[in-house]
A protein has these predicted regions:
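Long C-terminal appendages of very large multidomain proteins
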Residues: 1-252
């Protein structure tokens, strides 16, 4: 299945990253004991660890992250655990999209799955986005009948109202807030646009910048979410001027 293939590719990426970390730490340990020569690469890695920064060789083998080393390591372990649980227990009720190396690949896999089931071209499908009325993915009882439940996003530059079920102005001093789980529902591209929504760009990291991929899009950009605005005076344009975006991870 497309999701099975995607999982296999993600596991390969994580295994490679873990191997790089393991082998480099073993080599650094030997260098500190004086068993091997401390190379410039090892010295750079040692200094990075000393100052709570992600070593360059780990970053090169890893995923985009702005976190300091301690938080980055905790985040990586959570990602590995999510992958292990998926492997052992089958499809989760909700997918932690920010936990993937290549979240764009997960989105494509959902399109491919729907395309195969309904025997339709993949370019005739888009998503409707349905934020859930609760904040925890643990409250999702069973997988989505169509598409998938996805969780783990943060809103940058605005807040989320669970009462009004839409984006609202941030509270003073509150820069980023968690978004509820969202149901990604595949529909035909000819389906009408979701009313009273803001086309909110989703980025992997807070830099909102990356290198251009072969598709002409930034490698940091995942997709655009349609988030309810609640109507009234706060239209999508209002949130565009605010520079509101969704993020897959925080910087701390």
């Amino acid at each position: 299945t497309p999701l099975g293939t995607f999982l296999s590719q993600e596991i390969d990426q994580f295994n490679h990253l873990l191997n790089v970390i393991r082998s480099s730490l073993q080599l650094l340990t030997r260098a500190l004991k004086g068993e091997v020569v401390m190379s410039s690469t090892m010295e750079s890695m040692f200094n990075s660890v000393l100052f709570n920064q992600v070593p360059k060789n780990w970053a090169a083998a890893g995923y985009l992250s702005m976190k300091p080393l301690a938080s980055h390591f905790t985040d990586m372990l959570a990602r590995v655990e999510f992958m292990r649980t998926w492997c052992e227990r089958g499809l989760p009720t909700s997918f932690w999209l920010p936990g993937f190396f290549f979240p764009q690949g997960f989105v494509t896999s959902l399109f491919q799955t729907h395309s195969r089931i309904h025997k339709m071209p993949i370019d005739t499908i888009k998503f409707y986005f349905h934020p859930q009325p609760f904040m925890s993915e643990a409250q999702i009882q069973k997988p989505a009948a169509s598409g998938a439940f996805v969780h783990g996003f943060y809103l940058d530059g605005a807040a989320w109202s669970t009462e009004k079920h839409c984006i609202v102005e941030s509270k003073p001093g509150e820069l980023r807030v968690a978004l509820p789980p969202i149901h990604f529902e595949p529909v035909l591209v000819t389906a009408p646009q979701q009313p009273e929504t803001y086309e909110c760009p989703l980025y992997k990291a807070s830099t909102r910048a990356g290198t251009l991929s072969t598709t002409g899009l930034s490698t940091n950009f995942v997709l655009s979410l349609q988030l309810p605005t609640g109507g009234g005076n706060t239209t999508g344009d209002h949130w565009v001027r605010r520079g509101v975006a969704a993020l897959c991870m925080l910087d701390d």
